[in-house]
Amino acid sequence: MSNFWPQVAAATASLLLFPKVVQRIQLSRAKHRSLAGHSLMSKNLARWIPPLNYSARECFGLDGAPQSVVSQRQAGFKSLAHRLASESPRTREATQHVSLALSDLNFVSRYRFPIPFAQELSQQLRVGAVWKESGDNQLVDLDGRRFWDVTGSFGVNVLGLDAYKPLMRASCEEALSVGPLLGGYTGDIESVLDGLRRHSGMDEVSFHMSGTEAVMQAVRLARYHTRRKKIVRFSGAYHGWWDDVQPGVGNPMPPGHVFTLEEMSERALQVIRSRRDIACVLVNPLQAMHVNQNAPSDSALLAGERRLSFDRDAYTRWLQSLRQACTEAGVALILDEVFMGFRLGKRGAQGYFGVRADMVCYGKTIAGGWPVGVVCGGEHWMKRYNPLRPADICFARGTFNAHPAVIAGIKHFLLAIDTPEVTQLYRDADVTWQQALDAWNQRFESENIPIRVAGLQTIWSIEFLVPSRYHWLNLEALLGQASADTAKAARQ
């Protein structure tokens, strides 16, 4: 009998712990088998990676190329650096001066080259980041050199640089009549709300200062209404830089209430259905191009093994299954369209993939060139108070939310996309851009250039078909080509 009660206690403890053990195993199996799916592991590993700096002699011969090829690379890079420095002295000087005081530029400049090459090559080749003007989808630096804009200002530019100038001008002129009116609303608010509700299919709207803030508010509302803490995001997806949705490398805080799961996985759906602590699931439709991987970046050029694969039907089925799982579990499905909003169509990813979210977050694209964040959602999810408990509220404020210039910018953007011309562009976008990508790929193949392009409408990326350690040098070569194009245009 002396062992009876200890055995009972042990058995009881085992029974109580068993569901948690099963739950933990289930969660572990639902994570993507990569560092992107294991935030804490990647964060800890990053702290142990030692510095590696190649010398000038090593930088161009790491692939065992003959000395003649290495010499050509060295000479080409040196020539490019000299040409860019001599052709853009004012731009280079201004950029260097600004980087001493601007922490953002200092950080970006440090990681413009792959880390092992950065210390040596960044001193030789310094590019400009200060611009004089833009026009016709080109950027002009302080020295008059022109560059094609293929980045779209981090996703803001949907309509083209020149299309935004009249929108910004009109919104500024209208905002001047009321000045910095904050706390109230301008007369544009009615048409803006009508337009946002129509395009999103939602009941209510809230305004914020950035896409990151919009996602923060949507998550806060989901937690408020579900009384749960956990967030589900998918491997590789970006939802802004605040702690709860950007775990891992770059965030000094340990991963807290976020699960990073494998997208397009039945195991992820099982986790969502079975747990009772998940408040919301965040989906970035951009991931349809590269499921469970980070968006293509300079670091991807090191290996050149990146391949894009977009299957509209498969991703549609995934979103519909995810929608059903969230509904069954009482979990909010949040579409993060801060980048993708109004690229795939007037109803965004909801219309393109045929799925209805509980809340949609917009930013970047929607304000006609002005900074903004917007949350659109159903009445239940957007309510910030409990009518039966007056002190039970969900707080959200922002001094510059619904700024007159921003609201006017949204109005003019919505008017622009509702024109017959833009409506037709949306209707033909899939065919138009696929034809363009096919034409480029045919040209590359006919000229034996080992690259191809792939994408989703206006969002596209380059794939390298032959492995190389030096694909990233092509970015620098493009700067040299821009320089040559400017000189050629000046001679004509």
Model-inferred region functions:
Residues 4-6, 10-492:
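Conserved N-terminal phosphate-binding loop of PLP-dependent enzymes in the Aspartate aminotransferase
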